[in-house]
Amino acid sequence: MESRIGDTAPPDNHVHTEWSWDAAAGSMEATCSRALELGLPSIAFTEHVDATRWVLTGEAQSLMPPDRVGVDGRFDPATLDVDGYLACVERCRDRFPDLRILTGVELGEPHWFADLSRALLRSAPFDRVLGSLHSLHLDDGPWLVDHLFWGSAPDGVTPDEVVRSYLGETVRMIESSDLFEVLAHIDYPVRGWPAANGPFDPVEFEDEYRAVLRALAGSGRVLEVNTRLPMPPEIVGWWYESGGEAVSFGSDAHQPSLVGHGFADAAAMVESHGFRAGRDRFDFWRRRP
């Protein structure tokens, strides 16, 4: 488990609790306690908002909540209970006055569900809005990207093609949706990269990564350094070279023990590539002049 990070710890702007459909081990109160132990200045509870009905086969079905798998074998993510979530945030703000607690959502594929996403954002004031891509349309429907590496992908789809398709769709998401401020986990496919293919090398996909980063920088938005896995440092370097102005740190924790995971190493890496703490402890990290 992480030890106290210290006074220079960045905020954790990507955290899930029991209010996200895939965080059965989540607890907002326990996560707040852990954030204070680590010395985090603030935390953003960015709960999932997903509307994509994913194709599931074999092992993938067994890993999902069974009550959400339809008779057609597709998965229907549960809807966020906005009122219950906001009430829980207020209880935690009262209980943990020394921790700045931000509201937030992680919009899955917001460019595919613009009306739903816009209506959700109008329903309540959210401090942090992440845009994320978890899915790709292949053959008979949308597939979770990490599941495509498990041998259940349509015939002929290779790991390299999954990564390139993912990054191409991420460009389309940035260019066609202005509903989010922070791009979450640009390296999401790395989570499922097959060991048989050797270590993941981002340089093999440099052109595709740079296309995403140029689009994001041109829109004035923020790149997340997601610490679920160590971010390939090349990506942060390309972000700086693309004119990116800001970085957000997110553990993507789905249980309290993982909040702030990997932040000390990630902060050192980000600083070595030209970014530093912003205007105050609660700000994004900003590009050095």
Language-model segments: residues:
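Domain-core and long-helix interface of multi-subunit machines
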Residues: 19, 107-111, 123-126, 131-242
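Mid-to-C-terminal alpha-helical segments outside catalytic/metal-binding sites
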Residues: 261-289
